[in-house]
Amino acid sequence: MGKYDDLVFTIPKEFHDWYGFASPRGFFRGTTMMPKARVYMDFTAVTKELVMEVPHTHHAVDEYLVFTGADLNNFFEFDAEVDVWLGEDPERLELFTITEPTIIRVPPKLYHCPVNFRRISKPIMFSAVYLDGDWSKINRRVNAEGREEFTYDGAGIRRCVKNRAQECVYCGQCFSEAMKEFLEKAKEESAGDERLLPFYEMAKLPRTGKYDKYVYTFKPEAHNNPNFLSPRAGFRGWSEMEESRLWYLYNLVQRECTVGELHMHHAVEEYLFFTGADITDFFNFDAEVEIQLGEDPDHLETYTITEPTVIRIPPKLWHGPVTFKRVGAPINFMPFYPAGNYGRVIRQTQTDGSSHYLYKGTDLPK
């Protein structure tokens, strides 16, 4: 057993019955999988048209909705149309139609959803990234007296629809049954998209543009580093979207190499994700990766990764570099930093043998 084993988690194969989602899928469910984790996110490949969720909010935590090509080797090949609604008033939501790789920031108390995957000509990836260890949401409903009520739902408290004696394990069976019933009704001449009609009626009202600032289209980033596929994509926090609390990259590793340097983060966690490059085949991971971890930069432990994995890097834990010892097929290396600016501390040895610590960050004066 290693000292830092609790920080290294192999993502399990999640077999499920969710209609329109590739199975198995990769899902990191925060504290239910790793104590003290502060991120909860999935890697879902959407393969069919479907509708999910109702308007809801999150009380105190940002969420990010990510839509990209499912094959990260062809990140910008996005042959789909997705409708998403955002707004402060659940009866006056504004429609956003996504036709290219996009990330949406959902700040606390902003209503969002439904999500209508109304055309899927080629699989796309959908990730709901929740910046807390336990996912939760607040739903609004109007009771018989016409008064608003707000119900809480979250990981660990939802009960199984089929068997109330059991906790919901998100198998997707109830969703799939409802989705298939909805699609059958939609085929009828008079039914149409009855469930979605009120939301499309809202879209006919004048737009305020208030929520445009929360929607960011990924930009192709051409580069000359032969270790990573070009162009690549990323979301660099404040430099892309003011007040955002997320900074991460999609690095498609092409060959054996060593990247990064030994460093630590002063006050922010980091998560390092290693996954298959095609989200429809998430667990196809033909590589061997090594990384060193330790509280003391002179005494580090080496961890070897041979399957999809997430590593939690708490503040002040030294880590790196990352050595891709064998790359049989491209893999996705995703450094994930839940803050608006990225920063790290490195150690430099002076000529007299003493140590000097240097901060490097995107928030430094230009």
Regions found by a protein language model. Give the residues of each.
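A short beta-strand-loop-beta hairpin characteristic of the jelly-roll/cupin
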Residues: F67-T99, F274-T306, I346
